[in-house]
């Protein structure tokens, strides 16, 4: 297949590769993949090596009528998830992730609305950025400061996105507000003597989730709001 028909993505450690074939033609029974890389030989030296991988398509000819009737709605839909966490929406916005890469996108039709305490609605502008590590994920970041007591609603109309399988999305709507719990606290870090670029992460006690992250290159005051009682790591 030509390069323009392939969608590829390496994982964060650059040792695994995902690829999708963007071609509506009938696929052959066996896909031959040739991978060129440097391999250690018997003398411990790195030498060029080509590995031939045969990927055989699953046999679908014997499917019964009953199995076809068991096809779920998500099997014929561009499946996506849209989420926004109250504690993180100021920095991370609304996150949209699709099960498969997109071949058609229409973010201009997505609507972001703010609703004030008087239930008055106003349209908001937002920017769209594709995640640098996951090409199936997009971040929709509201422009302007988010206000406590307001509700923010993101509405995605149907048939605005089409994935590599040719399926369109269903409509979706997500609402979020900034936390208002009086028991929440905030942490402020004053960093001095900074003369290089640093990434400062606040993690939970298990250190398996980044709650908020900053990239700094000079002395900075970093705010970590909406913290529940507990232990954290920086």
Predicted regions located by residue number:
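N-terminal targeting or signal-anchor segments and their processing/structural boundaries
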Residues: 1-234
């Amino acid at each position: 297949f030509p390069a323009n028909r392939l969608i590829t993505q390496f994982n964060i450690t650059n040792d695994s590769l995902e690829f999708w074939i963007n071609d509506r033609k009938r696929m052959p029974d066996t896909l031959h993949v040739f991978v060129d890389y440097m391999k250690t030989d018997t003398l411990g030296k790195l030498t060029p090596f080509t590995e031939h991988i045969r990927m055989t398509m699953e046999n679908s000819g014997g499917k019964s009528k009953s199995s076809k009737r068991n096809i779920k709605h998500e099997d014929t839909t561009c499946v996506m998830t849209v989420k926004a966490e109250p504690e993180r929406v100021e920095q991370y916005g609304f996150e949209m992730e699709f099960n498969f890469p997109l071949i058609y996108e229409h973010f201009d039709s997505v609507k972001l609305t703010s609703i004030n305490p008087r239930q008055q609605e106003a349209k908001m502008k937002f920017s769209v950025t594709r995640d640098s590590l996951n090409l199936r994920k997009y971040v929709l970041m509201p422009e302007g400061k988010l206000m406590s007591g307001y509700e923010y609603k993101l509405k995605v109309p149907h048939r605005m996105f089409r994935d590599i399988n040719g399926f369109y999305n269903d409509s979706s709507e997500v609402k979020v507000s900034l936390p208002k719990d009086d028991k929440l606290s905030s942490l402020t870090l004053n960093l001095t003597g900074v003369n290089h670029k640093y990434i400062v992460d606040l993690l939970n006690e298990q250190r398996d989730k980044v709650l908020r992250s900053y990239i700094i290159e000079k002395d900075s005051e970093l705010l970590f709001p909406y913290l529940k009682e507990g232990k954290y790591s920086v």
